Amino acid sequence: VDEEKLNAALAAEAAASNRKIIVLDDDPTGVQTVHDIYVYTNWTVESLRKGFAAPEKLFFILTNSRGFTVAETTKAHREIAENTAKVAREFGMDYLIISRGDSTLRGHYPLETDLLREVTEAENGYKMDGDILCPYFREGGRFTLDNVHYVRYGAELVPCGQTEFAKDETFG
């Protein structure tokens, strides 16, 4: 794959789009790997307005929801979806919410994406087809090949179920 050509094509599509991409991160891992974009630590209407007004096509919201209870994450994700729909209407923009987490075992999947879908469908009057799972985190050394998720240790790829973390009952 010609990475330079691919990046140029993606940049051209993003520039032509009237869509804002909002990435929700359930812990700080993801935001540690990005640059030149805004990262908000709340989802107030005021913060979302700043994100929608910014020229960048994408912004992050660090929810830290991995550490939330079910009740807390339910409240937070309903608020995020409602506030995002409200602000998008104000700006006359389409949007896409990406729920980014690097652990489906320790996070609130599928609760969070189900809530986002439920509220977004109700707010916007269209049906979403489902979730797209992308088990890939290059910066964290995590890859999926032939339906097996691996963690890179140096030059070696180890199936994640065989890592020290998978065996550590206090980790998850």
Each language-model region and where it sits:
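Short coil-to-helix leader/linker segments, especially the first N-terminal amphipathic alpha-helix
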Residues: 1-8, 40-43
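Short secondary-structure capping/turn segments at boundaries of alpha-helices and beta-strands
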Residues: 6-11, 47-49
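Cap/lid and interdomain-hinge subdomains that line or gate substrate/regulatory clefts
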Residues: 11-25, 32-35, 51, 55-57, ...
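Short catalytic helix/loop segments, enriched in acidic residues and glycine
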Residues: 36-50
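Conserved beta-strand scaffold positions in the cores of enzyme catalytic domains, especially
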Residues: 39, 58-60
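Short loop/turn segments at strand-loop or loop-helix junctions that form parts
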Residues: 61-66
